[in-house]
């Protein structure tokens, strides 16, 4: 990320003066896909790509925002109830509203931002943007009184309330809590977390952009979540203590099979197995067993392709190609 580039665009677009610069990273998730909104475990890590924003209070009640990458400009009043039409501006609008709900006296500001997280590549450019502005508003207007846990929730609430995505907490948590050289095992129910050093000596983690873009709000994301909730509802008939798929065993799922559609059963089966895979990978990492880590990653891709059905031809091809070449991991959805 180039701070000077963002600064030069800010100076050019606004009044020739400078403001404060804030940045947050994107993320990868080594394993634990679609487990976060089921109360399970995930295993993300921050990356060296992210979002940078320059921000300067403007003495009004209006936010003036410029997307450098999209060359688009939006203004909105902080008292407005309706979010801007531009999808990117909804993230900034949502963060402002959510911070105000938490008692931060947000005032108008000028801002320009840019990033080097590939958009739509599953590396959480939106969470990086939300975290950047949550940090900024907390610093500029909130005396940093909002803690990091709550800043992550600000981003999640922004997705829920202003962007139409009923997401879990993983993306925002990884952006806020990410630490160089480590992955984070996050319990998405309790928000307890543990850092695991990641130093795959003898191996290299390769990130490949399939160039297939995804849009969570317009994809099957919300439908998958509904399938998980339907499976939980069926299991609850005999096990009322169950709240999320995190609480369900394969035995309990099999017991309720007659009340679950074939499609919903497959979705739930994948999630239950994936939650266990995260724990298995953490155990393997502590032993330095990267062969097992790679095997579990391959199992994850197979499950996402055949059970959760969120892969695509391009990713399946990349996964098979890597496997044929002797690699130990899998293509990342």
Where do the protein language model's features map onto the residues?
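C-terminal nucleotide
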Residues: 1-27, 52-85, 182-329
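Conserved small/polar residues in nucleotide/adenosyl-binding loops
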Residues: 331-333
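ATP-binding N-lobe of GHMP and related small-molecule kinases
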Residues: 1-127, 131-148, 153, 157, ...
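Short amphipathic alpha-helical segments at helix boundaries and their inter-helical linkers
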Residues: 166-168, 308-309
């Amino acid at each position: 990320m180039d701070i000077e580039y963002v600064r030069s665009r800010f100076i050019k677009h606004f009044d020739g003066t400078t403001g404060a610069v804030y940045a947050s990273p994107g993320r990868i998730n080594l394993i634990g896909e679609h487990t976060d909104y089921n109360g399970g475990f995930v295993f993300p890590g921050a990356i060296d790509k992210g979002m940078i924003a320059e921000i300067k209070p403007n003495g009004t009640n209006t936010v003036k925002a410029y997307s450098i990458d999209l060359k688009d400009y939006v203004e909105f009043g902080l008292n407005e109830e309706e979010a801007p039409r531009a999808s990117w501006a909804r993230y900034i609008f949502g963060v402002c509203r959510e911070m105000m709900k938490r008692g931060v006296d947000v005032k108008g500001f000028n801002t320009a931002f840019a990033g080097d997280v590939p958009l739509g590549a599953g590396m959480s450019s939106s969470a990086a943007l939300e975290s950047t502005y949550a940090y900024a508003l907390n610093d500029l207007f909130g005396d940093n009184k909002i803690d990091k846990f709550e800043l992550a929730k600000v981003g999640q609430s922004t997705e829920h309330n202003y962007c139409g995505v009923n997401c879990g907490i993983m993306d925002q948590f990884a952006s806020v809590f990410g630490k160089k050289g480590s992955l984070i095992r996050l319990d998405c129910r309790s928000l307890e977390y543990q850092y695991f050093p990641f130093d795959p000596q003898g191996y290299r983690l390769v990130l490949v952009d399939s160039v297939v873009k995804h849009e969570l709000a317009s994809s099957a994301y919300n439908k998958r979540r509904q399938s998980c909730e339907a499976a939980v509802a069926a299991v609850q008939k005999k096990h009322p203590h169950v709240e999320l798929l995190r609480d369900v065993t394969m035995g309990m799922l099999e017991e309720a099979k007659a009340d679950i559609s074939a499609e919903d059963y497959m979705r739930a089966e994948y999630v239950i197995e994936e939650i266990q895979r995260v724990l298995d990978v953490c155990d393997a990492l502590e032993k330095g067993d990267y062969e097992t880590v790679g095997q579990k990653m391959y199992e994850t891709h197979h499950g996402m392709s055949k059970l959760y059905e969120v892969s695509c031809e391009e990713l399946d091809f990349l996964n098979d190609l890597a496997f044929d070449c002797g690699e130990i991991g899998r293509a990342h959805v």
